[in-house]
């Protein structure tokens, strides 16, 4: 198993193998997911007090908040996959 880490901003990283979804925090269902994760102590806030721009959902039901755009995080995952395929 190859460990690949994705930078989600401010020196924070998430394991690319554990990511299920990267979404925008604007919709009501995502806001509910964040609230439930906070209540269940499964929320990781990696925004450093900045505005949340991406919500990363992992296979362990953890929810990670990032101040980086979802498109940027997605591109980092894709480019990391291409590097690991070589």
From Swiss-Prot:
InterPro entries: RemA-like (IPR007169). Pfam families: RemA-like. Belongs to the RemA family. HAMAP family: RemA (MF_01503). This is Putative regulatory protein OB1501. It comes from Oceanobacillus iheyensis (strain DSM 14371 / CIP 107618 / JCM 11309 / KCTC 3954 / HTE831).
